[in-house]
């Protein structure tokens, strides 16, 4: 009983903050024109979470849209217009007795998660006697189209892809293999979208698409 109490008393709790990664342009100054844009539909077109027993809620697409809006704003190249919370925004304007002065977007960004998957690989050393390991791998690919709101023309398109891997190894009874890590889904999706936004910014910088004068 004393031993159990001693072990319970030795439990420790730690925490730390982690700086989220940003798109490349977030760290560079910019004084040029910014595109007023909004984000339209962003759907999960991959087979992930779309099986026979799916509840029909597109959580992956919704997560991707949230990540995209964040990286677009942090890129310092766009005026990002919120179209998801129109009712709440209108209500707050009324509470302030102010008329809304909503901006219109020049472009709407639409996108899809075109590929998404998880896999696990493992190995053993001397039939597992000397150790064994497991690697969890997550892969994601997204496509984004820039659509002119007046003409419905797709003026620019980009793709982004990323892969995340988590490895653990147990050697002669020490260490342990990791259980399923669901955070890899968000990490690899963020990586792919961040890469796509980098390509969008590069397109502006080389004149492939640009704000209206």
Q: Would you name each region that the model predicts?
A:
Residues 1-3:
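Sec-dependent signal peptide recognition
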Residues 10-80, 85-97, 102, 166, ...:
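A structural "domain/chain start" motif
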Residues 12-13, 89-155, 165-179:
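Surface-exposed short loop/turn segments
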Residues 36-43, 67-71, 79-81, 106-114, ...:
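Soluble periplasmic/extracytoplasmic beta-strand elements of cell-envelope proteins
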Residues 155-157, 194-195:
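Juxtamembrane/interfacial segments around transmembrane helices
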Residues 162:
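Short, solvent-exposed beta-strand-to-loop segments that form ligand-recognition rims
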